[in-house]
């Protein structure tokens, strides 16, 4: 049985309680609110709960024996962007890069991790990142990103690249550039490798994106749920997905990462 909570935390709790009362041994859940996951854990009671795609803000909640998480490590998604940009600008002989950043929804783990990751990678690779302007917040929305970037383009602001927390916002920046008559002779980078994002990389409008594997996450969540129900080791069957446990933490057996993959013009055909 599948239910859509329509971004409503109270509905999500209700659906979990209904599933458990109806005899479900495990529930797979993409939490509406990463800060409110303890309520979902309470709702599932002694049954099994698999969080997918969006982890609890408080990872220690995963220490419970009947709770696990399957997703992709956001620490690496932005880092792949930064590695690409560092290599690009090193080849141009630049050691300092002025960037415009388009962020998703503030407070979300993905926004924070992706934004921090790209800057860390630039610094780790010997590039000094400098804000050309304060980050704009577009809530992962394409039209909002287009609207927010437009005035920065027409103001004559100097920058070397545009970094977006996802493909939709990167594509909004592409549209803003085209509307303003700005030649895209600088890298615009995104994350998720959506169909439109991959096409933009192929066409040269975006320099790169980062593939997040939704099928792998879904399969991993189902495998984890089955393992929990049948008392198997949680990682059983995860090997073919390339899943990695988070071995540095005491709740490592409850976290499984489905790897992100960098996508450029060289390999984008493999993702279309």
Residue ranges of model-derived segments:
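Hinge/cleft segment of the Venus flytrap/periplasmic-binding protein
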Residues: 98, 102-106, 110, 125, ...
């Amino acid at each position: 049985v599948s239910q859509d909570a329509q971004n409503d935390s109270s509905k999500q709790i209700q659906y979990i309680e209904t599933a458990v009362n109806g005899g479900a041994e495990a529930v797979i859940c993409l939490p509406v609110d990463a800060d409110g996951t303890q309520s979902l854990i309470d709702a599932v009671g002694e049954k099994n709960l698999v969080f997918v795609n969006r982890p609890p803000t408080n990872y220690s909640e995963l220490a419970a024996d009947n709770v696990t998480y399957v997703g992709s490590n956001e620490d690496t998604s932005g880092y792949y962007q930064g590695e690409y940009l560092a290599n690009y600008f090193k080849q141009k002989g630049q050691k300092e890069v002025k960037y415009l950043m388009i962020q998703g929804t503030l407070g979300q783990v993905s926004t924070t991790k992706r934004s921090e990751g790209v800057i860390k990678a630039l610094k780790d690779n010997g590039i000094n990142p400098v804000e050309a302007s304060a980050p704009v917040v577009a809530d992962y929305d394409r039209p909002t990103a287009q609207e927010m970037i437009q005035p920065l383009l027409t103001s004559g602001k100097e920058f070397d690249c545009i970094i977006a927390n996802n493909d939709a916002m990167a594509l909004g920046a592409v549209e803003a550039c085209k509307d303003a008559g700005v030649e895209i002779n600088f890298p615009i980078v995104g994350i998720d490798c959506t169909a439109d994002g991959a096409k933009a990389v192929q066409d040269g409008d975006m320099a790169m994106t980062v593939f997040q594997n939704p099928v792998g996450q879904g399969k991993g969540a189902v495998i984890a749920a089955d393992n929990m129900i049948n008392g198997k080791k949680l990682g059983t069957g995860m090997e073919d997905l390339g899943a990695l446990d988070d071995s540095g933490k005491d709740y490592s057996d409850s976290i499984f990462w489905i790897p992100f993959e960098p996508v450029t013009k060289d390999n984008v055909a493999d993702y279309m």
